[in-house]
């Protein structure tokens, strides 16, 4: 509120905080304002206001009910286990073993089994063009919502004249990265190199030791250089040091998000599922096979049964210990192979008909297998048009992912590439 006395503006202001609630279409509200005199500043004598006309100008800011991002997504979503506008299968619902299409999913879907939760999981699938967003002056694609009503988004480059139509290298960070690089604490042949964070250097001949290591929930103090700074922290022994790709992600976050934009983010779980396969390609059967597999490979290659549940608490990467392992410095990570499968990027036989398609490879954070002939661990990646897996030493694109807090509002836009959502807290 600003004031004038007999038409003369004065340097006197007052602010009224109205509860953050939705008033609906009617915005008429009555509020009582009281001042105490003398007032600090130029007008410190109440006599100055006697027999004068005082004009109060009110500027109100707010939002229309239902204009928050979560509600906008919710209003578009349909169940994924029924036939709908872009789902028409003999067995009703989306078939995740097949590529997305006009008859197998294109839009926003409610994950079956979560529809009655306080915050159901909504996810985008297929060649959609209504999940584009600008946050922290960068373009992002909305991937899915979280169990707390947050909104997980993935990096998609820099806006051009307010538009977000990036593909190829423009959709990734400038620096490509190996998932893990050889150093004094790790090698490409170490079984622990599939970790987004990793512990001891353990070779294939020591695989019994590796199985024991994966059960180690102990902690110790570790020192490493992360995002250009030396830090010493107590971490789980399995998560002592940051992988090469994590260092790239954390450095970018520190330089571009931390200072001005981190308040809009939630501390969600980033799942680096290191659970071992219990099937034919288990680590115990390695001598008679060409590789041993992780549980993610069983879910996404042997069958197509993606999951958004992280089975091992030690693999739930978070900043806080209240909802995960507490070993992260910043609330940022990579997508999982399961998440991009829901988005429409699956194993062999898929096409590039997904909003995540960029024409170039980029890392996700789900371990796949250890290959005997190359003596190297493999992690899943987006392989130009489908889900692939490659050795951790390969340098591929990096697309950081963050999760916006529940309650983020849409300032403008409709989510298209030409008119992306602009969001505010």
Please give the residue ranges for each predicted region.
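Long, domain-scale functional regions
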Residues: 16, 20-23, 68-425
